From Swiss-Prot:
Binding site for NAD(+): 71-76, 105-109, 129-130, 142, 151
Organism: Haemophilus ducreyi (strain 35000HP / ATCC 700724)
EC annotation from Swiss-Prot or TrEMBL: 4.2.3.4
Gene: aroB
Pfam families named in the record: DHQ_synthase, DHQS_C
UniProt-listed CDD domains: DHQS
Protein name as annotated: 3-dehydroquinate synthase
Class of the enzyme per the UniProt entry, highest EC level: lyase
Record-annotated membrane-spanning stretches: none
Function: Catalyzes the conversion of 3-deoxy-D-arabino-heptulosonate 7-phosphate (DAHP) to dehydroquinate (DHQ).
Native organism taxonomy: Bacteria, Pseudomonadati, Pseudomonadota, Gammaproteobacteria, Pasteurellales
Record's cofactor remark: Binds 1 divalent metal cation per subunit. Can use either Co(2+) or Zn(2+).
Length: 362
């Protein structure tokens, strides 16, 4: 078992990475005999892993209840949040309860926000079951639900007590979801670690085939990078915003199409290309670097052009609604070079449109 520790000012917790962790009672520390637990999952994940997790927790001596939410980004809503609160109240859960998020990013985000809010805060543990959740959304305490007018607009920073990453759960993950997770993996390389980007270029085929050792190394490196950034900037006042490379463009695609039409990682893939093209326009990246990024995304079976029918000017209203807008200025995460992300307000609207147009289908 590999472990990465997240060390924050007022909180620290382990990320445990390995095979067969769901059946190992030691993985679930700090849970112990007598603890009350509410597992939050969805029917897709529950059919594979709910019984395993529940039985292991019962073996530890926990009292376990479960609640299943509808599956998909379009259910990251007040209604799903309220469903968790209702289950907690109906089953008489108090402040000493622990929520366990068993699922992908949607389950993790909604469960985390429920944990932050229920009786002003209860403990929760992340068991991410998608690659994207394992390397990104389960780490760092960002919890949220969507609003019809914007993604992740209602939420809280609330850290888990532990993150349990069992790489075996990826064997039941749809190939499209594996690719979507690899978009965020590639983001870590291109934005923070050029050596890791080169390693990804060499190992993308093994990752697509879910080779266990390659996966474990990849997940560990992503977790190390994320943990280091979160430790510097827990509530996204500065450095942490760099993790949003490609996301301002990508969120525009998601919001325009309707959440859940394209997967988050698919939207981010195109968003990274558009941000990289803008970086090139501003005199930073080379055409060769842009081509390498495009090739790596294509090898991960990710889209490399905007959705059919979406024009460049349709991005702008969503981009202006982005949480990184400050004092009426659009703050974009761009690249000085591979591994060197930075934030700028210098790009003009015309430059942004030109960058997007390169990756729109005419």
């Amino acid at each position: 078992m590999l472990q990465v520790n997240v060390e924050l000012k007022h909180h620290h917790y382990p990320i445990k990475i390995g095979q067969g962790l769901l059946t190992n009672p030691q993985s679930y520390a700090p849970l112990k005999a007598g603890d009350n637990v509410m597992i939050v999952s969805n029917p897709t994940i529950a059919q594979y892993y709910l019984a395993t997790v529940r039985d292991t927790l019962i073996t530890i001596g926990c009292k376990v209840d479960t609640v299943l939410l509808a599956d998909g980004e379009q259910y990251k809503t007040f209604e799903s949040l309220n469903q968790i609160f209702t289950a907690l109240l109906e089953n008489d859960h108090h402040r000493d309860t622990t929520l366990v998020a068993l699922g992908g990013g949607v389950i993790g985000d909604v469960t985390g926000y429920a944990a932050a809010s229920y009786q002003r805060g209860v403990r929760f543990i992340q068991i991410p079951t998608t690659l994207l959740a394992q390397i990104d959304s389960s780490i760092g305490g960002k919890t949220a639900i969507n609003h019809p007018l914007g993604k992740n607009m209602i939420g809280a920073f609330y850290q888990p007590a532990a993150v349990i990453i069992d790489t075996q759960v990826l064997n039941t993950l749809a190939k499209r979801q594996v690719s979507a997770g690899l978009a965020e993996v590639i983001k870590y390389g291109v934005a923070f670690d050029s050596h890791f980007f080169e390693w990804l270029e060499q190992h993308i085929d093994q990752l697509m085939q879910l080779d266990p050792e390659t996966l474990a190394h990849c997940i560990q490196r992503c977790c190390q990078l994320k943990a280091a950034i979160v430790a510097q900037d827990e509530t996204e006042q500065g450095e942490r915003a760099l993790l949003n490379f490609g996301h301002t463009f990508g969120h525009s695609i998601e919001a325009h199409l309707g959440y859940g039409t394209w997967l988050h990682g698919e939207s981010v893939a195109v968003g990274m290309l558009e941000a990289a093209e803008l970086s090139k326009i501003l005199g930073n990246l080379t055409e060769d670097q842009l081509a390498r990024l495009e090739k790596l995304l294509a090898n991960a079976v990710l889209p490399t052009t905007s959705p059919d029918g979406m024009t460049a000017d349709q991005y702008l209203p969503y981009m202006w609604r982005d949480k990184k807008v400050l004092n009426g200025q659009l703050r974009l995460v761009l690249l000085k070079s591979f591994g060197q992300a930075y934030i700028t307000t210098e790009a003009t609207e015309q430059q942004i449109l030109t960058a997007i147009q390169r990756f729109t289908q005419h």
